[in-house]
Curated annotation (Swiss-Prot):
Family statement: Belongs to the universal ribosomal protein uS13 family.
Organism of origin: Rickettsia conorii (strain ATCC VR-613 / Malish 7)
Gene Ontology terms: biological process: translation
Matches recorded under NCBIfam families: uS13_bact
Keyword S-adenosyl-L-methionine: no
Subunit structure: Part of the 30S ribosomal subunit. Forms a loose heterodimer with protein S19. Forms two bridges to the 50S subunit in the 70S ribosome.
Function: Located at the top of the head of the 30S subunit, it contacts several helices of the 16S rRNA. In the 70S ribosome it contacts the 23S rRNA (bridge B1a) and protein L5 of the 50S subunit (bridge B1b), connecting the 2 subunits; these bridges are implicated in subunit movement. Contacts the tRNAs in the A and P-sites.
HAMAP family per UniProt: Ribosomal_uS13
InterPro entries from the UniProt entry: Rbsml_uS13_C (IPR027437), Ribosomal_uS13 (IPR001892), Ribosomal_uS13-like_H2TH (IPR010979), Ribosomal_uS13_bac-type (IPR019980), Ribosomal_uS13_CS (IPR018269)
Gene behind the chain: rpsM
Protein name: Small ribosomal subunit protein uS13
Keywords: Ribonucleoprotein, Ribosomal protein, RNA-binding, rRNA-binding, tRNA-binding
GO MF annotations, alphabetized: rRNA binding; structural constituent of ribosome; tRNA binding
Cellular component GO terms held in the UniProt record: cytosol; small ribosomal subunit
Length: 125
């Protein structure tokens, strides 16, 4: 397995698909990286030479934020919004959907497991 940006990418898949295993690289960005490195997108990772792998590593590390750096930046952005108490920050603090989704009947994933509410007390006759 080749190792790029501290991620083991699978050998038996096409290069474009393998690059998407790296956090922060989607199909479009993977294709763009292949074009910059002048490597065929259909080439499998196990067919790459050492020089091509080094070229890919250099392009990814110098021009793109991926893996740890990107995760850290996203976390800091969320923390900043929480600190300034903007609307999105408050939604993060309350563990509710941030981008305007409905919460009346949905958002179970974001809100967590449903909490049972005690039923009405039976009247004594």
């Amino acid at each position: 397995m080749a190792r790029i940006a501290s991620v083991n990418i699978p050998d038996n898949k096409r290069l474009v698909v393998s690059l998407t295993y790296i956090y922060g690289l989607g199909p479009a960005m993977a294709a763009e990286i292949c074009n910059k490195a002048k490597i065929s997108k259909d080439k499998k990772v196990k067919e790459l030479t050492d020089q091509e792998l080094i070229g890919l590593r250099n392009i990814i590390e110098s021009e793109y934020k991926v893996e740890g750096d990107l995760r850290r930046e996203v976390t800091l952005n969320i923390k900043k919004k929480k600190d300034i108490r903007c609307y999105q920050g408050l939604r993060h603090i309350r563990k509710l959907p941030v981008r305007g989704q409905n919460t009346h009947s949905n958002a179970r994933t974001r809100k967590g497991k449903a909490i049972a509410i005690a039923g009405k007390k039976k009247a004594v006759k």
